[in-house]
């Protein structure tokens, strides 16, 4: 069961990654159309304003179609066969579901969803152009999960020859069409009550203050090894747990209003404390890396620096910290618990000093969605955040250095044997086993992803040992038939992996942002045999 939950959480990362770019586009557009920043050139009707208005509208695509993107994104990772067709089926059935909901509202309740949307009545929205109940991303995710189940079960269903035209995607849609009718009726009956519960939750989270921010941030970090952290931040950042439509959309919608106001950001947007978890990526990660470097053996410092610098760059710029965190998680889990506590304390401290915003990503998000737009009227808050962050960088360094030395933790560069540092070089592994001898049959002439995939495929026990293969943002998630056939972690690290999570036959290989390409190469090798 846990394996399925982890897969589901990881699948949500496919659409989430799109927000990194579009958020910057909308943030920049907001800055460049702000007359307080740009002057008269940014007044409505000017060529400059019109240009950035067009760019902004394109950037808004992902935010306005978020439920559809989440619905289409899930089958990419969850469908066990013909993922592209599963995405098409999901889009068709999710749209059908929304039409059913709108029709039921009109026929049985006398409610014109189109009029409700036009009048901006809370609880209604146009999803993909269909006026319906606003089920937010939850509706898209639940329907997508149901369609994926139907797809995996019925796509290969063999029909009599005279009904052959209805096989495959058509049959899945036929079954789904029937299933969507009771789903729509249940939604109309249950969802309004659920919306009332969400409204109550929003009020509770708003009143929870500093303690709520601490708990939220702590859980978001501490659950990373399990993959369940997606279920912590998604309802807040992309769902309605804190504000309607989620913090991500709400912040972007009001960014110009907040930037032009002279009131404190915390009074304008108190719920913004639930999106401060990115600060540990910007300020905490460098402190951790410096502590590892400072405590490494003198003859290994150069190798440790070569290992950590690209990882820190990734963490700070893009907000992807798993490659760093998994360099010490399994050899020193106590450090990860301390990391979660410090991250939560940093976020709570910043919130106490009035820092709020949309800060779940990396430095690019901080600059373009927060610091640059807000600096003119909220410079004090921005400076306070940076000062507090740098103080915590020092705290991270001191605490991690103390614990590493006090407990003699074998972090990178402190291993008892020289051999261990070589685990991060796939070249050594290939030299030992021979170029292209991995079971995937990949030669040295092929690309780096293929080489990495070949080594990982061999470490997983070969294609015969793989039952399911998918990925999230940074991890390759694999279900194997026989865990005893897996090679030691050294084999995975030889391919450049940052760590391996083993839970019975459920395996997670932490690769980094190149994981989609690596997965694709492995799948190609498995098909070729």
From Swiss-Prot:
Top-level taxon of origin: Bacteria
Primary subcellular site in the record, as a coarse category: membrane
CDD domains reported for this sequence: PTS_IIB_glc
GO process annotations (BP): phosphoenolpyruvate-dependent sugar phosphotransferase system
Gene Ontology terms, MF aspect: kinase activity; protein-N(PI)-phosphohistidine-sugar phosphotransferase activity; protein-phosphocysteine-sugar phosphotransferase activity
Membrane association type: Multi-pass membrane protein
InterPro entries, sorted: Glu_permease_IIB, PTrfase_EIIB_Cys, PTS_EIIC, PTS_EIIC_1, PTS_Glucose_EIICBA, PTS_IIB_1, PTS_IIBC_a_glc
Active site: 472 (phosphocysteine intermediate)
Subcellular location: Cell membrane
PTS EIIC type-1 domain sequence ranges: 1-416
Enzyme class label: transferase
EC numbers on record: 2.7.1.-
UniProt comment concerning the protein's domains: The EIIC domain forms the PTS system translocation channel and contains the specific substrate-binding site.
Protein name: PTS system alpha-glucoside-specific EIICB component
Native source species: Leptotrichia buccalis (strain ATCC 14201 / DSM 1135 / JCM 12969 / NCTC 10249 / C-1013-b)
Lineage: Bacteria, Fusobacteriati, Fusobacteriota, Fusobacteriia, Fusobacteriales
């Amino acid at each position: 069961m846990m394996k399925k939950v982890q897969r589901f959480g990881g699948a949500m990362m496919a659409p989430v990654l799109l927000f990194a770019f579009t958020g910057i586009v909308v943030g920049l557009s907001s800055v460049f159309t702000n007359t307080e920043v740009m002057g008269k050139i940014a007044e409505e009707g000017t060529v400059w304003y019109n240009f950035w208005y067009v760019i902004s509208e394109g950037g808004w695509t992902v935010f306005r179609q978020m439920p559809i993107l989440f619905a289409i994104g899930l089958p990419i990772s969850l469908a066990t066969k013909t993922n592209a067709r599963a995405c098409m089926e999901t889009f068709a059935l999710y749209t059908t579901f929304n039409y059913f909901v709108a029709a039921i509202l009109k026929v049985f309740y006398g409610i014109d969803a189109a009029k409700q949307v036009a009048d901006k009545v809370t609880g209604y929205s146009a999803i993909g152009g269909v006026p319906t109940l606003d089920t937010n991303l939850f509706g898209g995710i639940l329907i997508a999960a149901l369609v994926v189940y139907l797809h995996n079960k019925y796509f290969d269903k063999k029909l009599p020859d005279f009904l052959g035209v209805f096989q495959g995607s058509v049959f899945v849609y036929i079954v789904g069409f029937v299933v969507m009718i009771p789903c729509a009726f249940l939604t109309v009956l249950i969802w309004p009550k659920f919306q009332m519960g969400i409204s109550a939750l929003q009020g509770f989270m708003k009143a929870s203050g500093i303690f709520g921010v601490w708990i939220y941030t702590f859980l978001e970090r501490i659950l990373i090894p399990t993959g369940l952290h997606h279920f912590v931040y998604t309802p807040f950042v992309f769902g309605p747990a804190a504000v309607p439509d989620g913090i991500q959309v709400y912040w972007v919608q009001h960014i110009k209003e907040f930037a032009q106001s002279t009131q404190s950001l915390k009074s304008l947007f108190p719920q913004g404390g639930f999106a401060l978890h990115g600060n540990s990526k910007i300020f905490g990660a460098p402190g951790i890396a410096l502590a590892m470097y400072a405590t490494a053996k003198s003859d290994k410092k150069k190798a440790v620096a070569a290992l950590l610098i690209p990882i820190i760059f990734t963490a700070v710029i893009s907000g992807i910290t798993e490659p760093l965190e998994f360099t010490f998680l399994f050899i020193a889990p106590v450090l990860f618990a301390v990391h979660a506590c410090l991250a939560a304390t940093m976020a709570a401290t910043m919130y106490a000093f009035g820092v709020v915003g949309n800060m779940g990503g990396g430095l690019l998000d901080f600059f373009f969605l927060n610091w640059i737009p807000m600096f003119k009227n909220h410079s004090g808050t921005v400076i306070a955040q940076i000062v507090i962050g740098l103080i915590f960088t020092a705290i991270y360094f001191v605490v991690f250095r103390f614990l590493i030395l006090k407990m003699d933790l074998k972090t990178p560069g402190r291993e008892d044997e020289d051999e261990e540092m070589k685990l991060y070089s796939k070249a050594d592994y290939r030299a030992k086993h021979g170029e292209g001898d991995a079971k995937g049959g990949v030669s040295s002439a092929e690309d780096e992803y293929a080489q990495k995939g070949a080594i990982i495929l061999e470490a997983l026990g070969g294609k015969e040992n793989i039952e399911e293969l998918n990925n999230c943002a940074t991890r390759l998630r694999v279900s194997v038939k026989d865990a005893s056939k897996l090679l030691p972690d050294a084999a995975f690290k030889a391919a450049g992996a940052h760590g391996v999570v083993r839970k019975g036959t459920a395996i997670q290989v932490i690769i980094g942002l190149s994981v989609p390409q690596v997965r694709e190469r492995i799948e190609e090798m498995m098909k070729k045999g």
